[in-house]
Design a protein with these regions (language model features):
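Nucleic-acid endonuclease domains
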Residues: 1-16, 21-22, 31-157
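Short hydrophobic-acidic sequence motifs that mark active-site Asp/Glu residues
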Residues: 26-28
Length: 157
């Protein structure tokens, strides 16, 4: 999707996803599906009921509701030294939000932590959720893409 939208080419090595031949920049791509948080904490007495409810059909979140419901999308295994630009996004029920930030901007990204795993240096993560979505929309939002537009984009490859 990102390759087709922005005319990127295949990566030059295994450490990034695509390459921008025009700007000579390494591109990393990370996306997450947005689902409403569970209504209840899962425990022994409600585990079966929670499993029945834990499907995308019941928990898919529309973009119109991103400020109304709790959700948590983790953009992880972010290795800033391995790319120049990160394209990241959210698959909402009705459309896709696409964001972009430079590797230099990630260090100051709302909620970024460079300590994803014990002893794992140079790799971090950040969350997009009800508390942080406004930061991403104001500072890093690139575009909305409907699923029909995505279908047409991919059909024309």
């Amino acid at each position: 999707m990102i390759e087709a939208l922005y005319k990127f080419t295949k990566s030059h090595n295994q450490f990034h996803d695509r390459y921008d031949e025009t700007k000579h920049k390494r591109i990393e791509i990370k996306f997450s599906t947005v689902m409403k948080a569970n209504e209840s904490v899962i425990n022994r007495s409600n585990a079966i009921d929670q499993c029945k409810k834990a499907n995308l059909g019941n928990r898919a979140l529309s973009s119109d509701d991103m400020y109304n419901y709790n959700f948590d999308c983790n953009i992880q295994q972010v290795k800033r030294a391995e790319f120049d630009f990160l394209y990241y996004g959210l698959f909402f029920a009705d459309k896709i939000a696409i964001f972009q930030m430079s590797s230099d901007e990630i260090q100051s990204c709302f909620g970024y932590s460079d300590k994803q795993h014990k002893g794992n240096e140079g790799e971090g993560q950040f969350h997009l959720n009800r508390k942080s979505i406004d930061y991403h929309m104001k500072n890093h939002f690139v575009q909305w893409l409907t699923y029909e537009e995505l279908y047409n984009l991919l059909s024309n490859l």
